[in-house]
């Protein structure tokens, strides 16, 4: 079938992609209908298709490739980025997809694709057909919105596994959020887990300089569970963080 080999290379595609191959929208629509009828492709959602393995009738693309194609600026974020980097503790079947262009949540092939609005376009890397937040942006976003990171314990376990981080990137990214609470939360976690992160102590100190005298709870979950006040960071944190992290004297 003409153009099938090129479509196979795309793995995930929309009508515009096929139009670029056929140079004719009607031909493109006919080709998509034919491929659907042969079970060579599956419809993911309106105007989004995934190529199938002909023998097993299973989709070739993984959830990350699909998510990255939902919108022209969409990318993997929050816990799904942890998942992409292989540092998850629990298996999640929700794929968090950030974009400036809203789409309706949908499910496909065992995964729920959930839209997360984003006004930022920094800290995003392209790996083949996948767009995903880099590790530094991922940890900031997940610390900022722990509910999208699987909760406090899941966040902590993922941070333990994420590995080395670029402290300069973290400070650069934090400026965009302009949040004293986030400086406190990120600075606290960097200090607590810096044996693994390996960031310069000056980065942690810079975070501390950015906070004021106001006291913050780490998140809403912290209010409901055992917690402890850390005066250095003006932060009330989950007690589970302190039983697992470095022994520090605040």
Enumerate the predicted regions with their spans.
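Hydrophobic alpha-helix position signal
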Residues: 35, 81-82, 190
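Short beta-edge/loop segments at beta->alpha junctions of small alpha/beta modules
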Residues: 1-73, 107, 168-178, 183
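Short, intrinsically disordered, mixed-charge
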Residues: 37, 83, 87, 145-148
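Exposed, interaction-prone assembly regions rather than primary DNA-binding/catalytic cores
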Residues: 78-128, 134
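An N-terminal domain-start capping segment
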Residues: 1-26, 105-106, 122-125, 129-137, ...
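Short, surface-exposed acidic
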Residues: 26-28, 90-91, 199
